[in-house]
């Protein structure tokens, strides 16, 4: 009979800075490195943690659009994806997505250890 294998999962809650993707990604990277050190294989971050969440309803359409990133060329997801590959960890994170048709979405992306990405769009 096969021995059961364990899988370590963790979730992170942190105080993001509104409109400050650089800061938020720096904090996220620190949590990812800590999780890797602790041999975590699945790590989830909050909804819209890259861009910030609570301030968005107060922004103008132009300000929200400026925060959005197309997923395929997203600098934020390029970093998260590279860390997922490096640490062989599934990392989930949220941001404002700009779709190919220009529409904006509250998206949650799972960056997989093999480099693939899977997206859920909140309506």
Please describe what each predicted stretch is.
Residues 1-5:
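Basic/polar N-terminal segments that are highly enriched at the extreme N-terminus
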